[in-house]
Design a protein with these regions (language model features):
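N-terminal, active-site-proximal structural segment of metallo-dependent hydrolase catalytic domains
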Residues: 2, 6, 10-100, 110-121, ...
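Extracellular/periplasmic catalytic domains that process cell-envelope and extracellular macromolecules
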Residues: 21-25, 62-64, 96-100, 120-124, ...
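Active-site beta-strand/loop signature of hydrolases that rely on acidic residues for catalysis
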Residues: 29-34, 58-87, 130, 168, ...
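Acidic/histidine-rich helix-loop elements
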Residues: 31-55, 150-159, 187-208
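Active-site environment of divalent metal-dependent phosphoester hydrolases
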Residues: 38, 77-80, 114, 189-190, ...
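Extracytoplasmic/secreted proteins, especially bacterial periplasmic and envelope-associated proteins
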Residues: 53-61, 86-89, 93, 125, ...
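Structured beta-strand-rich core segments of catalytic domains in phosphoester-bond hydrolases
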Residues: 75-187, 305
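Metal-dependent phosphoester-hydrolase catalytic domains
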Residues: 220-231, 238-339
């Protein structure tokens, strides 16, 4: 497995803060679409167990990169096949992994944040937020649908399969500073429910993505009404350059966030975030993004695209996911408490 580990920078906090009295903390954020289990993709190079062992590779990537907080997309519970047998449970395999023993999980099925893409499909999907339990305490958590009625999980996303955003408010055990983490997944081009899943013309799909992005922006404003530091990441299924409209660009243009890639002082490793399950794909863009709340003068010191492919000596390829992970090292600031 090729793993990129984000290195620490040694620095004086006062050199980074606008005001020497500011409270600051270095945090490593990660984002990873792990590729939902399907029987159709449980073949090489993406088997969940042997021989590709995605169930072990994914936790190892998280541990080796030493993320303090990591957002995951496309995580599933077990579901019943037509023959009555059960599929593996990605979430339970991850909870049981020794490589993830340092993490607590927020916004999962245990908190009612599992969902179905459409009714009456089973509620097997979730977007967990993992955080190091020795560094942070969970204050509150939740999730919403990117739709006209965000708190109604019986509703679709504007007539399309449901897409959600999960979120958590965390408190630093080092300085008691609190911040929000938002974890999103914008629609792929499956088309409206009842359309057979074959997709729609590109413009219609992009417009739907922007509808979801606008809900995302409005809900973030409602939830983080105190303007605390925050991170938003996920699979946006769009680059900032996607034309004629871009969901990722719409969120960035809201003025709430800075992009960690374009703001980073150092880019350790670059490349596409969708690997297409090939060693050298034609797609070179980034559809997975880590955005940092613009308020409170955050500093992005490092950024990296983390490859999720490993190659055996005989040339055999194994993929933990069809996405590469994204990693960033950020210094968050809080205003000092009033005297």
């Amino acid at each position: 497995m090729v793993v990129v580990v984000v290195s620490s920078l040694i620095m004086e906090p006062a050199a980074r803060a606008e005001n020497e009295a500011d409270i600051a903390e270095d945090i490593r954020f990660g984002d990873f679409n792990i590729l939902a289990y399907r029987d159709s993709n449980n073949i090489s190079p993406t088997t969940w167990y042997e021989p590709d062992n995605r169930s072990q590779a994914i936790p190892r990537i998280i541990k080796d990169n030493d993320w303090d907080v990591v957002n995951l997309q496309e995580v599933q519970t077990a579901f019943r096949r037509k023959d009555g047998s059960m599929t593996p449970s990605q979430i339970e395999d991850m909870r049981a992994s020794a490589d993830l023993s340092a993490y607590d999980f927020a916004a999962t099925d245990k908190e009612g944040c599992n969902f179905s893409t459409s009714n009456p499909m089973p509620k097997i999907w979730m977007q967990p937020i993992l955080y190091k339990s020795d560094k942070f305490a969970l204050v509150t958590q939740g999730c919403f649908v990117m739709s006209q009625t965000p708190n109604d999980f019986s509703e679709t996303s504007f007539g399309w399969p449901r897409n959600i955003t999960s979120w958590a408010r965390l408190r630093s055990k080092a300085n008691s500073g609190e911040f929000y983490v938002f974890n999103t997944h914008i629609a792929a081009n499956y088309g409206p429910i009842g359309g057979g899943g074959g997709g729609v013309p590109r413009q219609e799909w992009l417009n739907h993505q922007v509808d979801q992005a606008n809900v995302l922006i409005s809900q973030i404003k409602v939830i983080n009404d105190e303007n605390l530091p925050m991170m938003l990441s996920g699979d946006f299924n769009s680059t900032f350059e996607t034309t004629p409209v871009s969901a990722a660009g719409t969120v960035l243009d809201s003025g709430l966030f800075i992009d960690s890639y374009n703001s980073a002082e150092t880019v350790l490793t670059d490349g596409p975030t969708w690997n297409q399950l090939v060693e050298h794909g034609r797609f070179t863009g980034k559809i997975d993004h880590i955005l940092i709340g613009e308020e409170n003068s955050p500093v992005v010191t490092e950024y990296a695209v983390v490859p999720t492919m490993r190659k055996d000596a005989d040339g055999t390829l194994h993929f933990a996911s069809d996405h590469n992970a994204v990693s960033t090292h950020v210094i968050l600031h809080w205003a000092p408490p009033e005297a």
